[in-house]
Regions:
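Acidic/histidine-rich catalytic neighborhood of metal-dependent amide-processing enzymes
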Residues: 146-147, 151-234
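Acidic/His- and Gly-rich active-site-bordering loop/insert found
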Residues: 12-150, 171-176
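Solvent-exposed loop/turn segments at secondary-structure junctions
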Residues: 60-61, 109, 120-123, 187-191, ...
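Loop/turn elements at helix/coil->beta-strand transitions in domains of secreted/extracellular proteins
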Residues: 110-113, 176-180, 208-211, 417-419, ...
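Conserved hydrophobic/aromatic beta-strand scaffold that supports enzyme active sites
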Residues: 101-103, 213, 246
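Metal-dependent amide/peptide-bond hydrolase catalytic core
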Residues: 4-43, 48, 90, 218-238, ...
Length: 494
């Protein structure tokens, strides 16, 4: 017995030693670079221009509804007036009536270009909430150190930030070695099927193959990573897919005084409950696992130990992360019942009821896998079909070992000293889904600091962006272009 206990004790000590060695020898994957000091931005003037853009109600509507044409055309004219050097130096094309494509030719046209993306459209303001806004949603008010209004954060901060950065570089006499492309969509919030899709098709027809693409997406997480005081630039290297499934239940209709054992509403409600109680399995892989790999070396030892030893602690880490919606969404295909229809009067039984359940699909899963899961979970008697035409598969994962990702890390370190950077899985969708065939290196990042409370404002009430943070975003875009497209001065005339 004593011998057995001794062997067990030695085994435990060896295990602890292995765990501690793995945790204590993790190498940092951060990039350290000298801070940039020669990119002065007039924060107040830049904020005024962003505020002006917010005042245009460029609301995108579902397919089949009219575009807010005048608002987009007015915004186009505003951008032209606000950034005169951009519009004198770059070529601008209007795509699909309202999207914009800019080209800044490089003096080495044989180099693959870079593509910076964002979108000009915004989601509607929820009817009835207008009075809950501190400042009217399309006022573009500047107050308390913030620019307020719908689209300030999603995503006019990127559209204007990119243009401000390019305007700054032109003013400094910068000439890109490689071509710089800017693509601003007009219907991202409803899938990008007209604007972004048309722009991607146009670039493909021209044989354009960008070295890398950057769109909106991950943010600078401020106070949102447990164990880390430093803000973290969450650079999304992949995004989830999307599908909404329509569930249909049928039963006998008639008067509520003589109901069947199960009404159509009861059947569809039970189906939704089964889906909520039986989510698709969690996995720690892909971009989420890489995020842990980048952040674990920066954590205190106690927090680092389980992440450095997922071979042992993965089940426990999954249980811990599944307790919070945000972290749970990084590990699994999520299930969200969003709409239900089944009644017209309190004493009338309809013969049919429907529910719509939205799934954000984890890379490694698929639309087909979601449908199979739904059918097996809700059981027979419930109709299952894909709703609408916005279904999309998860994106491929862009590699963090590529020079393009390191370029983003370097720019973060130069513009935001002391900030960490890590890959990330984006739970939402972006216009990049239409551009995936153009480049294997696709990233999603907005260089603006955000707290957990700020996230609720995006698509919600009191959307805003800090004047100071916006100036930082302008510097980031300018430095990113310098890093990616800079080089020796172009040769002079012979």
């Amino acid at each position: 017995m004593k011998k057995t206990l001794a062997v067990l004790g030695i085994a435990v000590l060896v295990l602890l030693a292995v765990l501690l060695v793995r945790a204590s020898t993790l190498k940092s994957r951060q990039v350290k670079a000298e801070p940039v000091t020669d990119l002065a931005v007039d924060a107040n003037a830049a904020a005024q221009r962003l505020a002006g853009a917010v005042r245009f109600p460029t609301v995108s509507h579902e397919q089949g509804k009219d575009v807010e044409a005048q608002a987009f055309l007015d915004l186009h004219r505003y951008l032209e007036a606000s950034f005169p050097q951009v519009h004198r130096t770059l070529t601008r094309e209007v795509v699909a009536d309202y999207s914009l494509l800019y080209t800044w030719p490089g003096w080495k046209p044989e180099l693959p270009p870079i593509l910076l993306m964002s979108h000009m459209d915004v989601v509607p303001v929820e009817p009835g909430t207008e009075r809950q806004w501190t400042h009217p949603p399309f006022s573009g008010a500047i107050a308390e150190g913030y620019i307020w209004g719908r689209g300030a954060m999603d995503d006019k901060v990127s559209v204007l930030g990119v243009l401000e950065g390019i305007e700054t570089l032109i003013g400094q006499g910068f000439q890109p070695e490689r071509t710089v492309l800017l693509a601003f969509g007009h219907d991202e919030e409803v899938g990008g099927l007209r604007g972004a899709a048309a722009t991607a098709k146009l670039l493909a027809s021209r044989g354009v193959r960008p070295a890398w693409i950057l769109d909106e997406g991950g943010i600078i997480a401020k106070g949102m990573v447990p164990g880390l005081d430093a803000p973290v630039a969450m650079i999304s290297t992949a995004e989830k897919g999307f599908v909404t499934v329509e569930l249909t239940a049928r039963s006998h209709g008639g008067h509520s005084s003589m109901p069947p054992r199960s009404t159509a509403i009861g059947l569809v409600a039970a189906a939704v409950q089964r889906l909520e109680q039986n989510p698709m399995p969690a996995r720690i892989d892909g971009a989420t696992r890489e995020s842990f790999d980048f952040l674990a070396p920066e954590l205190p030892l106690a927090a680092r130990l389980p992440l450095a030893n997922l071979w042992l602690f993965e089940p426990a880490v999954k249980r811990q992360l599944s307790g919070e919606p945000a972290s749970d969404a990084r590990m699994r295909t999520t299930t969200a019942a969003t709409m239900i229809r089944g009644g017209v009067k309190e004493n009338v039984l309809l013969s049919e009821a429907k529910a719509w359940v939205n799934f954000r699909i984890l890379p490694g899963d698929s639309v087909a896998a979601v449908l199979e899961h739904v059918r097996s979970t809700v059981g027979p008697g419930i109709g299952v079909a894909v709703s609408g035409n916005l279904a999309s598969e998860p994106s491929p994962q862009s590699q963090t070992g590529e020079e393009s990702f390191r370029l983003l890390q370097t720019t973060v370190s130069q513009v935001f000293p002391g900030m960490l950077a890590a890959p990330n899985l984006l739970s939402g969708g972006t216009d990049t889904k239409h551009f995936l065939q153009l480049s294997p290196n696709v990233y999603r990042f907005i260089p603006v600091a955000v707290t957990a409370g700020d996230l609720e404002r995006v698509h919600g009430t009191n959307e805003r962006v800090s004047v100071e943070d916006y100036a930082g975003a302008v510097r980031f875009y300018a430095q990113l272009v310098r890093n990616a497209a800079g080089g020796p001065s172009p040769p002079g005339p012979l």
